[in-house]
């Protein structure tokens, strides 16, 4: 059975206290950015230290969060090297990786079978084939790809830009997001499990949740006072807004 896609993923943490605050709010997944050009970049050694420190914390509302490493154009071997020093629950591919990247990774003799979340843009029909090819991996029982993350397109920066997706393109959900879910979910036609990202804030998350109805949401800049520094009040307002919509 594949890992369940989180309903809430907060990304780009650089401080243990911020992660603890997010987990106390019940956030289901924490993103750690291993892209050296990102303002939220942390070295794998620092990430391991943070995870070790968090493991000592007790009494958190969310007992089993997913810790997801964000990688941009790493080779499978480079990702494997990070995984050896920094245990992660899943990895997020946020660069130009093709579906062949997954095949190459899964062919490595020491590949741990870590679940893969694929971040992709959606700008309309020009991205239909890309969504379909990765959606097919999500639908496959034998693939480690367990979901998609739909983010804003930026030819230079990879995530965390605050740019908004053209979310209106996802209402109604395009056919490329649908697949035969018989093998995985026991249903004839289902939508690809995906997280909505790109410019979400406490002020707009409820609106776009109601319109797009994704599996979950991902946010970085919308809960920060500056890149990598989370604002606890913004995190709380974001979670409150999400929950008010999710319970409707």
Model-derived features: positions:
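C-terminal helical cap(s) of enzyme catalytic domains, especially alpha/beta-barrels
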Residues: 44-54, 103-107, 220-248
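N-terminal amphipathic alpha-helix/helix-capping segment at the start of soluble metabolic enzymes
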Residues: 1-10, 182
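Well-formed, non-transmembrane alpha-helical positions, independent of function
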Residues: 21-24, 81-85, 104, 207-211, ...
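Alpha-helix N-cap and loop-to-helix initiation/capping positions
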Residues: 14, 38-49, 161-165, 169, ...
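N-terminal basic/disordered segments at the start of proteins
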Residues: 8-18
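Glycine-rich adenosine-cofactor-binding loop
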Residues: 10-12, 196-201
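Glycine-rich phosphate-binding active-site loops on the catalytic face of alpha/beta enzymes
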Residues: 27-39, 92-98, 153-157, 212-235
